[in-house]
Amino acid sequence: LQRPFESDGFGLLADEAAALELSARLLRFTFRRHDNGYRRRRIDEAADILNSEFARPLTIAEIARRVGLNECYLKRYFKAQTGETVAGRLRRLRLEHALALIESGSTVQAAMHFCGYRHAGRFNEAFRRHYGFLPSDAKKC
């Protein structure tokens, strides 16, 4: 990449700069492709944790640590990949399982505790917002 007719040395510097820029672009492209696969696997892993451990008192910080992402990236990429927020997915899973338990004969209190809720007021409010009726009304249906 040397320019033999330029004696000031700047031609060589310009060529080296162009080569470095090309190398940087290739590396960014390579890592971006790898990074997307890495992130996709991390988000799938986070979804698996939510699906299997929804009844535990999970935090976004704990999930992020376990999958190797920081909290902001986890929240951003989870929403982009799944269409749901991490907290929204956790709430939906808990409430769906609670409804199934109540409909199969469990008490509201047992379903609430099994699905990770510790306070009846919060459970009732989340349930009502999600389904449009209270958990006690689900038993009557």
Show which residues each predicted segment covers.
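An amphipathic alpha-helical interaction segment
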Residues: 1-41, 45
